[in-house]
Amino acid sequence: MRVNLLIAMIIFALIWPATALRAAVSKTTWADAPAREFVFVENNSDDNFFVTPGGALDPRLTGANRWTGLKYNGSGTIYQQSLGYIDNGYNTGLYTNWKFDMWLENSPVSSPLTGLRCINWYAGCNMTTSLILPQTTDASGFYGATVTSGGAKWMHGMLSDAFYQYLQQMPVGSSFTMTINACQTSVNYDANSGARCKDQASGNWYVRNVTHTKAANLRLINTHSLAEVFINSDGVPTLGEGNADCRTQTIGSRSGLSCKMVNYTLQTNGLSNTSIHIFPAIANSSLASAVGAYDMQFSLNGSSWKPVSNTAYYYTFNEMKSADSIYVFFSSNFFKQMVNLGISDINTKDLFNFRFQNTTSPESGWYEFSTSNTLIIKPRDFSISIISDEYTQTPSREGYVGSGESALDFGYIVTTSGKTAADEVLIKVTGPAQVIGGRSYCVFSSDDGKAKVPFPATLSFITRNGATKTYDAGCDDSWRDMTDALWLTTPWTDISGEVGQMDKTTVKFSIPMDNAISLRTVDDNGWFGEVSASGEIHVQATWRNIN
């Protein structure tokens, strides 16, 4: 017995010093987090994504992958103050000047995180990015982010675009589980050399499994639909060209114009949620102050309406489940106040947007999205407009270069409105251009910019004597006269009794695909592949001697 005891004591004596000399981070493995549901917003109007809790906030999976017009920049109301991020549900604080790693096991995507998320206006955060960059990242996470001094920072990892793309393709009702590792240490290790927080002599390492279920997918559809609205001095609207779903309407004592402004699809797994609110907001503060709450109203069905008044009136997620559109009503007084404030020739996407607020997540629950359709609002007295005859903001064409190939043709409708016909109407084409042999050509380029190919271009219209007039346009930014076009005239009478007229004509912009010069680049080299270009067509009108 004494021998055995002595041996045990010797073994203990040999082992104990080795154990006493070994130090490590303190590892805590938390119990699995309760599964959480999220709502994913796929914004095709603005080309970005947003994810927000369908129920409880923690563990967090919340925020947008891009800044919106609600981004806080240091003054005014604080709305969107960080981009999207995750955590393990404990919202653990970080120590100043310590280093922080976050990595995922069983990650749904490669390279899921970009760095340490922070609130952009807090001291030590980046106002532009809401991100503290790590020393390095890999397929699992990020490493060596130094916790800056100033405002509070937490164990939050900012989501990569790859993570959002994974959430986008998930079927509604499906789930994923991942293990979140979060580690902080006071040791100043070099993550670029492969060192990691979990291997240091001190620190805190937390491990937790989290599960998220996609409870809903809200897809905002960009219809590219376009319509013109002409308003007189009293704010009375007149619909011009276009295919947006608009009609004159009277709501209570207010007359005006209502239009379907948002198209969406909403798939759910049966989620019930009332913390998600959606409502429009006027972007121009002067106009917002000048109009009354009922001068702008919104509806899910075009018949029952709510006034626009900051966050006071909204539709909830549950209410949106029974619809697929949002309508907006503009009263004549709304338009009249625009006239009084000198707001004209404006696109509705610059006039107002829709806001998305999830009251469950105050730091990252704000989001903004543009309308699906666009209204071009112009004064009826002395204005000119040009829109695609397809009633879309960005018409496009594609084709092949070679003998017998068809031209790329774009049709447009030009409208003038005034007390009389315009004395002069001019048109021009702008875009990448180069003069070759004394003639201007539109220049199309390959994605890498190495191939630049010249294309001729023309503007043509029917004149009042029935002939076709054609200009060599070449993207040269030079005005051409189209006053002698064949105009279709519609008289109008203002509410004051003043008379005027609206004149319309059509014009075609054409890019031939069969010109031999387009078989070679501007450097006279052969080329093969794809080239592209974009440009603009501008019009202007002049009225003289108007009393």
Curated annotation (Swiss-Prot):
Tell me the leader sequence span: 1-20
Q: Which UniProt keywords apply?
A: Fimbrium, Signal
Instruction: Tell me where in or outside the cell this protein is found.
Output: Fimbrium
Q: What happens when the gene is disrupted?
A: Mutants do not express ECP and are defective in biofilm formation.
- Per its record, what triggers expression of this gene product? Negatively regulated by H-NS. Positively regulated by IHF and EcpR.
Membrane-crossing segments per the record: none
A GO term from the CC aspect? pilus
Mostly located where? other
List S-S links within the chain.
none
Homology family: Belongs to the EcpD/MatE family.
Function comment:
Part of the ecpRABCDE operon, which encodes the E.coli common pilus (ECP). ECP is found in both commensal and pathogenic strains and plays a dual role in early-stage biofilm development and host cell recognition. Tip pilus adhesin, which is required for assembly of EcpA into fibers.
- Describe the subunit structure: Forms polymers. Interacts with EcpA.
The identity of this protein, by name, is Fimbria adhesin EcpD
Species this chain originates from: Escherichia coli O18:K1:H7 (strain IHE3034 / ExPEC)
Taxonomic path: Bacteria, Pseudomonadati, Pseudomonadota, Gammaproteobacteria, Enterobacterales
